[in-house]
Amino acid sequence: MSFFVYLLVSTNGNTYVGATVDLTRRLRQHNKEIKGGAHATGVKVAQGETWTRAGHVSGFPDWPAALQFEWRWKHLSRKYGVKMNPLERRMNALRDLLALERPTS
């Protein structure tokens, strides 16, 4: 089984980082095409936004490693502050995370 951590961007420029085993299904859930999870992004969809996948990271040995990477990506994004474009903030955090010797520990 493959594990993914993904980055979504909304039509309004918002971003979301999450983890899944099925990228296509998860994006459909975020866009409320099918039921299941995705509560945080569902509000935006109700306001007329749609989500697209900007990218993903794969190659995690197990689900806990993917969740650890997701958590670190989200938290590293915060160090760039709110003045930076949300997508730029997420991409800078991803760059920093991938530069670490052990990004999942």
PLM features per residue range, with description:
Residues M84-S105:
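A cross-kingdom feature marking charged/low-complexity
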Residues V5-S10, N14-D22, R26, H30, ...:
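GIY-YIG nuclease signature motif recognition
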